[in-house]
Amino acid sequence: MSSDAEMAVFGEAAPYLRKSEKERIEAQNKPFDAKSSVFVVDAKESYVKATVQSREGGKVTAKTEGGATVTVKEDQVFSMNPPKYDKIEDMAMMTHLHEPAVLYNLKERYAAWMIYTYSGLFCVTVNPYKWLPVYNPEVVAAYRGKKRQEAPPHIFSISDNAYQFMLTDRENQSILITGESGAGKTVNTKRVIQYFATIAVTGDKKKEEAPSGKMQGTLEDQIISANPLLEAFGNAKTVRNDNSSRFGKFIRIHFGATGKLASADIETYLLEKSRVTFQLKAERSYHIFYQVMSNKKPELIEMLLITTNPYDFAYVSQGEITVPSIDDQEELMATDTAVDILGFTADEKVAIYKLTGAVMHYGNMKFKQKQREEQAEPDGTEVADKAAYLTSLNSADLLKALCYPRVKVGNEYVTKGQTVQQVYNSVGALAKAMYEKMFLWMVTRINQQLDTKQPRQYFIGVLDIAGFEIFDFNTLEQLCINFTNEKLQQFFNHHMFVLEQEEYKKEGIEWEFIDFGMDLAACIELIEKPMGIFSILEEECMFPKATDTSFKNKLYEQHLGKSNNFQKPKPAKGKAEAHFSLVHYAGTVDYNIIGWLDKNKDPLNETVVGLYQKSGLKTLAFLFSGGQAAEAEGGGGKKGGKKKGSSFQTVSALFRENLNKLMTNLKSTHPHFVRCLIPNETKTPGAMEHELVLHQLRCNGVLEGIRICRKGFPSRILYADFKQRYKVLNASAIPEGQFIDSKKASEKLLGSIDIDHTQYKFGHTKVFFKAGLLGTLEEMRDEKLAQLITRTQAVCRGYLMRVEFRKMMERRESIFCIQYNVRAFMNVKHWPWMKLYFKIKPLLKSAETEKEMATMKEDFEKAKEDLAKSEAKRKELEEKMVALMQEKNDLQLQVQAEADGLADAEERCDQLIKTKIQLEAKIKELTERAEDEEEINAELTAKKRKLEDECSELKKDIDDLELTLAKVEKEKHATENKVKNLTEEMAGLDENIVKLTKEKKALQEAHQQTLDDLQAEEDKVNTLTKAKTKLEQQVDDLEGSLEQEKKLRMDLERAKRKLEGDLKLAQESTMDIENDKQQLDEKLKKKEFEMSNLQSKIEDEQALGMQLQKKIKELQARIEELEEEIEAERASRAKAEKQRSDLSRELEEISERLEEAGGATSAQIEMNKKREAEFQKMRRDLEEATLQHEATAAALRKKHADSVAELGEQIDNLQRVKQKLEKEKSELKMEIDDLASNMETVSKAKGNLEKMCRTLEDQLSEVKTKEEEQQRLINELSAQKARLHTESGEFSRQLDEKDAMVSQLSRGKQAFTQQIEELKRQLEEESKAKNALAHALQSARHDCDLLREQYEEEQEAKAELQRAMSKANSEVAQWRTKYETDAIQRTEELEEAKKKLAQRLQDAEEHVEAVNSKCASLEKTKQRLQNEVEDLMIDVERSNAACAALDKKQRNFDKVLAEWKQKYEETQAELEASQKESRSLSTELFKVKNAYEESLDQLETLKRENKNLQQEISDLTEQIAEGGKHIHELEKIKKQIDQEKSELQASLEEAEASLEHEEGKILRIQLELNQVKSEIDRKIAEKDEEIDQLKRNHLRVVESMQSTLDAEIRSRNDALRIKKKMEGDLNEMEIQLNHANRQAAEAIRNLRNTQGMLKDTQLHLDDALRGQDDLKEQLAMVERRANLMQAEIEELRASLEQTERSRRVAEQELLDASERVQLLHTQNTSLINTKKKLETDISQIQGEMEDIVQEARNAEEKAKKAITDAAMMAEELKKEQDTSAHLERMKKNMEQTVKDLQHRLDEAEQLALKGGKKQIQKLEARVRELENEVENEQKRNIEAVKGLRKHERRVKELTYQTEEDRKNVLRLQDLVDKLQTKVKAYKRQAEEAEEQSNVNLAKFRKIQHELEEAEERADIAESQVNKLRVKSREVHTKVISEE
C-alpha cells in the first residue's frame, strides 16, 4: 500500500481512489471475531451482516445489524472477511470469496466514492451518477508508467497497462467496456481516449491553420473532439440513461513504433435510426435536434426555418424534450466547435444543419385522402416547401414523387398510387435513411481527418457498444443490441474461462476443468444459426406475401418447445403486446415483431431517392449516390451502404456481417475488460440496490472471473525470459560455465527462492504464477538489484581508493630514497677520490656503451621491420574485409532482386489466377448459352413436328374440300343466275369476314408481341415456323386447286376480258412481294451481323487463350531463371563460405604471429628496464612502439572477431533467405502445377469452343448457300411477274367488256344492301359475344357441329368452308379485302397470293434449314421441304398456262357460297327446333338438380365413411411405424453379429427371390388397378359422348323423360344398396383390422420372446432349412391372399359395371358421385389389402430376422471356436517353430561334433599307427552311432517342417473361413437393408393411396364445376338460338318479298 505522501501526486482525487493510512490502521486494529461475523441471506436486501449467536442441527441463529434475530440454514451463512480486507482494491485477494463479500466490498467502496475496483484480471466500475475529480490532468500524469499493483484501481491504470503491453509484447490491444445501458460505458470510453491522447502526444500540429483561417487542432484534439460530434448525432435519452449511445463504436488508436500517437479511426455499428421518427414517452430523440432549437445560435433558427419549441415538430416531441443533466446550449457550442476542429468545410457544416432541419420538417408534412379514392394528396404545401428548400429540391416534384412514385415493372416504369398511410411510411423511411446516411458520412469524414498517413505499428481498440436493454416495448433494434452483448459476453467467457483452462491443459499443468456455467452458445445459435431467428426473418423478407403473422408462426413452428431460450410470453396488463421471449444472459426479454419485415428490408421511395441524387445540395446528392456505399463501409458504418440491384442484402444480414468482423478483430487482439455496473434504477448517487448489482455480477461473470483468478494462474512467462529476468534473485542456483536448459534453470531458481511453492506451476513452455506472485517476484528483484548495485558501487569505490593508496605509498618510498641519496651525495661530492671517479667512470664504459648502442640499433631496426610487416598485413586484411563487405552487399542486392522477382512472380500469378477466374466465368456463360440454344432447338423441333401433324390434317381437309368442289361443279350451271344475284351479297359478307379476320389477327399480334417480350429470339423462330406452316397449308390448297384449274382452263378463256381489272391487284401483289423480299433481306443481314459478332467473340476467346499460353510460358521461363539464380546463389554462398574459412585461417595465423611478437616485445621491455639511465630515451621509444603494436594487434583481433561474427550472421541470414527461397520455389512449383492443370481445362474448353465455332461456320455456309438459292428463285419470280404484267394488258380490255355486266348486277346489289347491313350488325354482336364469352362461342360451334352431323352433306359443306376460312384468315386477309365485285378478281388474287406465299415458304425454309443444321435428326424433313419447293416451282410454271381455267373455279366457289346461304336458312329452322329442345333440357336439368342434391347428401355420408377409413389408415401407419421401431431394434442386434455360416446363403437368396416374386405380384395388382382407373376414365369420356348424343336426340329425350326418371329412381335404389354393401364391407374391414392388431401384438410378443431365447439358444443348419420351409409356406400364403385380392378386384369390376349401367341413364353429376363412391371403395379395399400385405411382410421379416439372428449366433459361436482353434494352432505352430529351431541348433552342434570327431579320427589314425586296431574300431563304432543320430535328427526335422506347413495351411483355411463368414454377414446386412426399404415402400404406397382419395375428391369438385358451366352454356345457346331464329325469319321474309 502506498503512503499518504505517495498518494499526494493524485491531488484532490486521492480520497476517491484509495483509503488513507489512518483508515487502514484503524481497520487493522478493529476487533473482529472470524467465527461469529457472517453474512446471512435476507429476503429484501439479499444479504445482510450479522453476528452468530448459536448453531444447532444445521440451523444458525444470528442477529443482524438492524437488531433482528433470524434463523437460517447452514448453507445460507457466509463468513465475513477480516477488517483489513474492507474496501480491498482487488477482490481476488479476499480470504472468503462469495457473493455477499463481493457485494459489500463494492458497496462500501461505492459509499466512499471509490468507483473502480479490480476483480481478478479485469476492472469493475460503478456509475456514481455525479461528477468526481478522478479524471484531472494530475491523475493522468500520476498513472503514467505505473504498474497495476503500484496504483489504485482506475480506468487510467487499465489504459496504461494496455499501452505498456503493446510496447513490450508488440501486440495489438483492445479494451472492452461492457455493461447494461446506463452503466457508464460512454464516459469511460471518453476517459480512455483522453488518457491515450495525453500520454502519447505526437508533439507536432497536423495543420497549424488552414488557408481560410479555419480552426483545426492537433491529432489528439481531433480524437477527443470526435466524441462530442458523435454523441450529438448518435446519443439520446432513454429510460435508464440520459446520454445513452444509440450506436456502437470501435475506436482504434494507432501508435508508431516508439509509442507516439500516429492516427485513429472509428467503426460504428447499428445506429438506431427508428428513434428519428418515434420515441417512447420517457425518452427523447437524438440530442442534435434539441441543440439546434436551444437558440444558442439564432442564425441556425433562421437558416433551418424552425422554431425554438420542440412541440412544433412531430418527430422530436413524442417523448420528453428536456433532460436535467444536459445543457443543450453548451452541448450545441461543443458540437459546433468539434465540427470545426475535425476539419469539416463550411459547406459541409451548413449541409449537416440543413439535413437535420429537413428531417424535422419531414415529420410535419400532412397528407389527406382524395374524395371517393384511396389516393393520397398533399394537405398543404408550406412544410413541403421548407423541406424542399433545405434539401435544394423542387417542392412540387417532391410531393409528386411521394404521392405518385414510379416503380419498375419489367422493363418499363409505371406510376403507382399511394394511400395516406403509405405516404407517411415513405416519408418516415426517407427521413430515417437521410439521417443514417448523414451519420455514416460524418464518421467517414472523421476517419479521413484522423488518418495522418504517419507510419503506424500497433493499435489499441476501445469498444463502446450499446448495453443490454430490456424495455416495455422491445423491437428489432433491441434484439440486435442484445445479441451483440450476448456475443461479447460469450467472448469474455471464452477468453476468461475456457481459453484460460485450455491453456493449462495444453501446458500440462495439473488442472481439474471447472465448469463456470457461462456458456451462451444456445442463445447465440438460436438467433444466428441456420433456421434461427435472423435466418427465418431473412427468409420471410424474400417472400412477397410474407407478413408479421407468418413470421411469428414460423418462429413458433421452428423453436417453440424445442429451445429453452425461446418462450411464448405471458400477456401482461398495461404493457405492450409481446410475440416471443428470449432468455438472454442478463434476463428474459419480450419482443414485439410488428414491422420487422419492413425494417429488415429497409425499403425506400426510389423516385424520391432519384430526386435526392439530383439535389443542388452536394452533400445530399453524394449521400444517395452510388459511391456512398463503399465509403460508408470504409468508414466503418454498420449499414453504410446497402447493396442494391445485384444482390438483396437485408439489415440483419449486414448487421451480422459487421458483428462477425468485430469479433474477428477482437480475437486478434489482447483484450482488457472493464465491466460497468448500474447501482440503482433511480439514478440516485451513492445508493446501491443489492439484487440489481448481484444480477449484473452473476451475468457478467465477475464472480467466476475472481474464482478462476484465484484458482488458476493468471500470470505466465516463458522459461527463457524468466531465467534472464529473475536470475539475479539467486545466481548461484544456476551453475556457470555449463549448459543448462531454461526450464531446469527456472525450476532450480524458483526452488531456491523463499516463496510459497504452491503458488506456481511449471508448464511445457512457460512457468505459471498465481495472482500476486509475479508482483512479489518483481519486488524481490527490485530489492535484489538495489542490493547488487549498492554492493557493486562499494566494491568499485574501495578498489579505486586502494589503487590511489598504493600510488601514494610508492611516491613516499621514492621520495625517501631520493632524499637519502641526495643527502649522501651532498656529503661525498667534494671528496677527491669521488671527483677522480667522476672523471674516469665514463671513459671505462664508453666502449661497452657503444657496443650496446649498436645492438640496440639492430633491435630497433628489426622492430621497425616487424612493424612494417604487421602494417602491410593489416592493410591486406582491411582490403580483404572491404572485398568481403562488397560481396556481402552484392549478395544482399541479389537477394533483394530475387525478392523483387518473387514479388513480380506473385503479382503475375495473381493476375493469372484472376484471368483464369474470368475465363472460367466466360466458359460457364458460353456453356449456359449453349444449353439454352439446345433447349430452344429441342422446342423448335417439337413445334415443327406438331406443325407437320397439323399440315397432314390440313391436307386431309383440303382433299375433302376438293371432293365437295367437284360435286358443286356439277350443279354450277343450274345455279348461275343465283350466283349473279348473290355476288354482291357475298362481297358484303367477305367484308364482314375481313373485319373478323382483322380482329383475330390483332389478337394474334398482341399475343405475339407478348411472346417477343419474353424471348425475342424464340419469337423470331416461332414466327418463321408459323409462316412456314401456313405456307405449307396454302401450298397444299393450291396443289389441289391447280388440278382443277387444268380442267377449267378452256372455260376461262371466254372470261379473259373480265380479268383486265385484275392488273392493278397484280401490281399491288408485286409490291407486297418486293416488300417481303426487303424484310427478308434485313433479317438475313441481321443474322449475318449476329454471326459476325459470334465469330468475333470466338476470335477474342482464341486470342485470350493464346495470351494465357504465352503468360504460362513466360512464367515457366521465369521459374527456370529463378532456379538458375538460386543455383548461382548456392555457388556464391559456397564461395563465400570458402573465403570465410580462408580468412579465418589467415586471421588465426596473424593472431599467433602477433602473440609471438607481443612476447618478444615484452621481453625486450624487461631487458630495457635494466639499462642505465642514459638509455631512457631509447627505452621510451621502444615502449611506445610496443604499445602501439599491441594496440594494433588488439584492434585487429577485435576487428577480426567482429568480422567473423558478422560473417556468421550474414551466413545465417543467407541460410534463412535460402530456405525461404526454396520454400517459395516449392510454392511456385505447386502454383505452376495448378496453373498447368487450369490451362489444360482452359485448353479443353477452348477446343470445345473451337468445335462450336466450326459448327457455326458450317451452319453459316449452309445459310449462305440457301440464300443464293432463294435469290435465284426471286429472279425467276421477277421474270414471271414481267410476263404477268404483259398479260394484264389483255385482261384490262376484257375488263371493259365486263363493265356492262357490272351495271346490271349493281341493281341486284342495291336490293341486298339492307340484308348485308343487318348481317354485319349480327356478325358484330356475335364477335362481341365471342370476345366476352370464349367458352360460349366454343359451345355454339360445338352445337353447329352437331347440327352439321344431322344434316350430313349440306352441313358438312358449310363446316368445311368455315374451317378453311378460319385456318386461312391470317394469310388470305389481304386478297379477301381486295375482293369487290366479281369472282374473277378473287381468282386472280389467289394466284398472286400463291406467289407471295411461295416466296414466304422459301424464307421459312431458310430458317428451318438453319435450325435443322443444329439437329441432325430433322434432316429428312429438310430434304422433303426442299423437294416440295422444287415441285411448287414447277406448279407455278404450269399455273401460268392455266390462268383461263380459273373462271370455272370461281363459279364453283360462287355456287358453294350460294349453297352455304341456303344451308344457313335451313339452319335457322333447325335452331327453332333446338330452342324447343333447350326448353325441354331446362326442365330435365331442374329434375337433375333435385337428384343432384340428393346425391350430395349421399356424398356427405360417403365423406364421413371415408374419414373413418382414413383414421383406420392412420392407425395402420402407426402400427407400421411401431413395426419399423422393432425392426430398428433387430438391426441393433444384427450389428453385433460378426460371422455367419455360408450355408445360409442359398436360403436367403430363395427368400429374396420369393420377395421379388411378391413385389411382381404387387406391381401386377397395381397395374390392374391402374387399368381399372383408365377404364373408369374411358367410361367418363363415353359419358361425355353420351351427353352429346342426348343433345342431338333431344326430341327423343323429351318423349322418354318419364322413363328416364324411373331409371333414375332405380339407380338411386342401386346406390343405396351399394352404400349398404359398403357399410357391410366396412364392418368386415373393422373386424379384419382388429384381427390384424391382435396379430401385430402377438408378433411383438413373439419378437420379445425370440429376443429372450436368442441369448440361450444356438441353432445350426437345420434351423436355416426350417426357416426356408417357413418362407415357402409364407409365399404360398401370400399367393392365396393375392388370389383373394384378385377375386375382390373382380367383384369390384362387376360393381363398377353395374354402376356404369346406372350412370348411363342418370345425369352427369349423379354419375360422378357414384363414380367417386366406387373409387373410394376401391381405394379403401386396396388400402386394406396393403395393410394385410404389410402385416404379412412384417411377420415374414420378423421370421427371417429370427432365423438370421439364430444363424448369426451359430456363426458367431463357430467363428469364436475357429478363432480359438486358430489361436491354438498358432501356439502349436510357435511351439513347432521353436522345436524346429532347437533341432536346427542341435543339427549344427552335431555337424560341429562330426567335424571334431573327424579331426579326432585323423589324430586317432595317426595314433593307430602307434596305438593299435582296437582304438580304431572303437572310434569307428562311435562315428557310426553319431551318424545314425544325425540322420534321425534330420528325419525329425523334416517331419517337424511338414507339421509346420500343415499347421500354416490350417491357419490359412481358418482365415479364409473367417473372411467368408464376414462376407456372409455383410450379405445379411444388405438383405436386411433391402427388407427395410420394402417396408418403407409399403408405407409410401399407403400414403399414395391417401393422396389418391384426395385427388378423387378434387375430380368430383371439378366435374361439379363443369356441370355448372354446361348449364351456363345451355342458357347461352338457348338465347343465341332465339336470336338466330328471329334473324333467319327476317332474312327469309326479305328474300321471298324480293323474289
Swiss-Prot record:
Highest taxon of the lineage: Eukaryota
Chain positions with Phosphotyrosine modification: Y389, Y424, Y1464, Y1492
PTM sites of type Phosphothreonine: T64, T69, T391, T419, T776, T1241, T1255, T1265, T1286, T1467, T1501, T1517, T1730, T1736
A cellular component term, taken from the record's GO annotations: myosin filament
Entry keyword set: Actin-binding, ATP-binding, Calmodulin-binding, Coiled coil, Cytoplasm, Methylation, Motor protein, Muscle protein, Myosin, Nucleotide-binding, Phosphoprotein, Thick filament
Entry's Gene Ontology molecular function annotations: actin filament binding; ATP binding; calmodulin binding; double-stranded RNA binding; microfilament motor activity
Residues carrying Phosphoserine: 36, 79, 392, 625, 1092, 1096, 1162, 1237, 1243, 1261, 1278, 1288, 1292, 1303, 1306, 1413, 1474, 1495, 1514, 1542, 1547, 1554, 1574, 1600, 1603, 1714, 1726, 1739
Modification N6,N6,N6-trimethyllysine occurs at: K130
Pros-methylhistidine found at: H757
InterPro entries, A to Z: Kinesin_motor_dom_sf (IPR036961), Myosin_head_motor_dom-like (IPR001609), Myosin_N (IPR004009), Myosin_S1_N (IPR008989), Myosin_tail (IPR002928), P-loop_NTPase (IPR027417), XRCC4-like_C (IPR014751)
Coiled coil: 843-1939
SMART domains found in the cross-reference section: MYSc
Chain spans, region Actin-binding: 659-681, 761-775
Gene Ontology terms: biological process: muscle contraction; muscle structure development; response to gravity; response to muscle activity; response to muscle stretch
Residue ranges constituting the Myosin N-terminal SH3-like domain according to the UniProt record: 33-82
Listed Pfam families: Myosin_head (PF00063), Myosin_N (PF02736), Myosin_tail_1 (PF01576)
Annotated positions binding ATP: G179, E180, S181, G182, A183, G184, K185, T186
UniProt domain Myosin motor: residue ranges: 86-782
Subcellular location: Cytoplasm, Myofibril
Family the UniProt entry places it in: Belongs to the TRAFAC class myosin-kinesin ATPase superfamily. Myosin family.
Domain topic, free-text comment: The rodlike tail sequence is highly repetitive, showing cycles of a 28-residue repeat pattern composed of 4 heptapeptides, characteristic for alpha-helical coiled coils. Limited proteolysis of myosin heavy chain produces 1 light meromyosin (LMM) and 1 heavy meromyosin (HMM). HMM can be further cleaved into 2 globular subfragments (S1) and 1 rod-shaped subfragment (S2).
PANTHER family (UniProt xref): MYOSIN HEAVY CHAIN, NON-MUSCLE, MYOSIN-4
Known function: Muscle contraction.
Quaternary assembly: Muscle myosin is a hexameric protein that consists of 2 heavy chain subunits (MHC), 2 alkali light chain subunits (MLC) and 2 regulatory light chain subunits (MLC-2).
Identification of the protein by name: Myosin-4
